[in-house]
Amino acid sequence: VSQEQIGVTTTGQPIFDYATGRDNFMLTNSDREAKSTSFSLVARHDYDFGLDWMVGYAFTDAEDISPMTSSTAGSNFDNLATNTIVNPEPGISNYNTPHRITARLSYGKEFFAGYESRITAMFYRKQGQGQSHVMGSVDLEGDGAFGRHLLYVPGPNDGNVVVGPDFDVAAFQAFIEREGYGQGFVDRNENNAAWSSRLDLRIDQEIPTFLGASKGRVYLKIYNVMNMIDDSKGLQYDAQFFSQQVVDSNVNAQGQYVFNTFTDRGLTDLLENQSLWEMRLGIQFEF
């Protein structure tokens, strides 16, 4: 509530600045509607000779008004990628995973009478969550020290943008083509982090306990088998936590965006610890 609109850019984007104090926030419910669509499919079958399998697919297209990634009002406000800082519009949710495939294959057999041996493989492949490419917020809101305004992609002879002498036009064009952006403002979380895949393996062997009705088993779990075989495989990815500012920009007196410098930044964050393979050997007793 401490910022008021003082003008617009040549694109019609509102420009805000502090008018009544600084960093005063009023939390209320939005009058905008965020929508979501999701569905899932599962197929499975069990065979009488000990084999069973399952394959599933899930699709999600979910919006939110604010991802609420912080425990404080200030950073929740500052970290939202948007072009409307007051009463922001719905956008693709930071937590949206568009596509996820899961599969399980298991086989059990009694090689020793009364004691089952079983091997189970679990696999998933999922698309990364979305994140936003942004430009500078200088001259677009009070402070504006951290860029969080959605990137504007100029078209040919676009009068909304002035390019500075240090701006790498060729690198920027290559970036736009790689990311698949069209002319105009990119959408919030329009692009996604890289896909991740993982294969886990579990081997169980039932064993006698000689303790009445109790049961025992020895198990071996291998998490991320692909990474165990090849350390360049099975890598786990997530979207960068913060929006990625690729253009250092400001607004001139005519309301045009001035693109000063370009920095190529991707949206994908490698989760190193989760990408490592792990093996566990244990004994389980059930009384």
PLM segments and residue spans:
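Aromatic sugar-binding interfaces of carbohydrate-active proteins
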Residues: K215-V251
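Residues that define the transmembrane beta-barrel architecture of outer-membrane proteins
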Residues: K35-T37, T97-I101, W195-L199, S275-M279
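Gram-negative outer-membrane beta-barrel transporters
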Residues: V1-G130
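Outer-membrane beta-barrel architecture
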Residues: V42, M54, R104-S106, R202-D204, ...
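Outer-membrane beta-barrel translocator domains and adjoining extracellular loop/strand segments
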Residues: S66-T72, S132-V138, D231-Q236
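Extracytoplasmic gating/loop element in the C-terminal half of outer-membrane beta-barrel translocons
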Residues: F112, R118-F210, R217, F242-Q274
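Outer-membrane beta-barrel "beta-signal"
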Residues: N273-F287
